[in-house]
Amino acid sequence: MKYLCQWGTAAIMLMAFTADGQSAPPLNQHPVEKTFLFNQLPEKITVPVSALQSIFSVTVNSNIIVSLGTQLKIEGSVIAKVAVTEDQLSMNIRCTNYQNALLNISRITETDGSFSYIGRMVSLQHGDVLLLWEEKGQYSFIRQKQLLAMVE
């Protein structure tokens, strides 16, 4: 019994020292603070559906100027227009008036023949992003920090 108690004490001490050795090293990297590209825009910009529909009439390599609401005007060129599936058409627009930010917007055909839209405008050199949201039948661009949005 005496040896069992000594072996138990040694095992507990060994586990304690091993567990202490497993602590993670301190993180010395901090996220890079980037300037904001869309800080002159409001937090939420209402977008009429007609403006979103007009974007999809433009062809690849064409220049585009479209007002997405009263506070957001897009100027740039269509760099890609791809039918991802038979129900989803996606476009990439390089926005020259927003330091070559990329506007990716998709039109999804619903089963009843109506359309829904999703999208985002992002620049990897800046710390914010505009996300296109649909809420209660109304579309809006919402400004968020880029840390909160996934960028491929």
Predicted regions: what they are:
Residues A16-T18:
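N-terminal signal peptide c-region/cleavage motif recognized by signal peptidases
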Residues K2-A10:
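Sec-dependent signal peptide recognition
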Residues C5-Q6, D20-Q22:
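Long, terminal "pre-/pro-" and other extracytoplasmic accessory regions
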Residues G21-E152:
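N-terminal prosegments of processed precursors
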